[in-house]
Amino acid sequence: FFDTAEMYSVPPKKETQGSTEKIIGNWFNERKNRDSIILATKVCGRAPFTWLREDKSPTEHSKKQIFEAVDKSLLRLKTDYIDLYQLHWPDRPMNLFGGPLNYQHIEGETNSIESILDGLSELIKIGKIRHIGLSNETPWGTMEFLHQSKNKNLPRVQSIQNAYNLLNRIFEFGGSEIVFREKVGLLAYSPLAQGYLTGKYQNGNLPKGSRKELFDRLQRYEGIGSEEAIEKYLDIAKKHNVDPSQLANQFVTTRPFVTSNIICLLYTSDAADD
């Protein structure tokens, strides 16, 4: 199972956009093994990433943009179909990625969930994608997609890809019940809390070449009590003579509501720990 996205690598910028899909596509071309891989990629939600679209407009989940994004991903991936096509984050305005907890309802023009599903349905019918999934979605959003697909006879969401780890267990509130009852698979990403659960950033450490040094966008795991919680997890790992990375990954992998644990490596040498 390979998971990527049209905007990768991160942080998103014009110079590197699509590079991860190109790497995977070249790998498929060399190995001739496309049919042995379940391939997932993602289309950007609403964001000011004007370099992604031909008309330089901000990204959104309009039918036109989704069709354009799929075609470009297929070219980069050197394939004629995508097994799982995911909405990277919601099209509607909302708090995301470590924002404040005091939710404020934000009204704004957005593509309806029905229209998004309708566009994805066309892509399934012509064979460019096979299944659809969500990412960084809320319990309400997940249920609304399921509701619309049932009522309008449109494709059903098969998965949701959200962050889940020892420092971020928000998915257990609402999300876990939905995936059980509705049979929607959780693809859990960031099992190491973007590296924090390895302990390498403790006491202000900043290893050279680490994700935090390369692009410091990890403040969501630097809140009050985070360092103390990490220290306690490190103590547990030490007590049982296991690597902290393995402890964190096994926690995610063994949860009964997790379908797959998505591991992201900055360097190939990290694979030994995971």
Label for each model-derived stretch:
Residues F1-V43, F67, D71, D80, ...:
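N-terminal binding-site loop/beta-alpha segment at the start of enzyme catalytic domains
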